[in-house]
Amino acid sequence: MLEGAGTIRDSARPGPRGRTTDHQEDPITSDVGTHRSAKAASWVYSEEFVPEDEVLLRARDRAAELGCPAVLPGVGAVLQVLAASLAARAVVEIGTGTGVASIWLLRGMPADGVLTTIDVEVEHQRAAKAAFAEEGVPASRTRTIPGRASDVLPRLTDGAYDLVLVGADKHSYPEYVEQGLRLLRPGGVLAVDGALSHDRVADPARRDEVTTIVREVGRSLRSDERVLPALLPSGDGLLLAVRR
């Protein structure tokens, strides 16, 4: 098991299987329960498939200390693959946190790639800079911008970026997604973390504000002719959209 990933196993633990009134297993319910159990085990396996090293684990520890959300390892691995496959030289990250996602992205980007990362919390960016230093990332490869993304994003150039990661303030996801699409070049990828919102998005009975916002963002991208979307179960859900 991956060090520091205990919460992954806890969150993936399946519930009890259904039983008939005479205490014999209902075959149909048993099959569903077995499938769910296998799915949970597969999710944990996929999250731990690419292990995090000491730099990432320390950044994750800082996130826990600051009460700052961080992408799970499965999402980080996907982001690294995306950055590498796109040869992404210009990336925008909305929500720096303590640099967990940033490190994954930088590892996938070419040596001359530049990550522009935005966070309203200066303390978070200070922690991220410590992670960048531990990783040995040259200062020229990161542009850390303190401030509200809603104020910063409009100042960035249209169609100039290969990859945009949305991972902060779910209330503002609709705005960030629209801004992200504006920033992407044709063939660029928008990535939205937390797209399943702790399994609430898939439950139509859940109608709280954040869940509704995240669900509508997914529906909007699914019907948007400007993009080709896909929803991955990695981490807490990773919604991807390729700009046509």
Task: Report each predicted region and the residues it spans.
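A short alpha-helical cap/connector motif
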Residues: 2-163, 170-191, 195-244
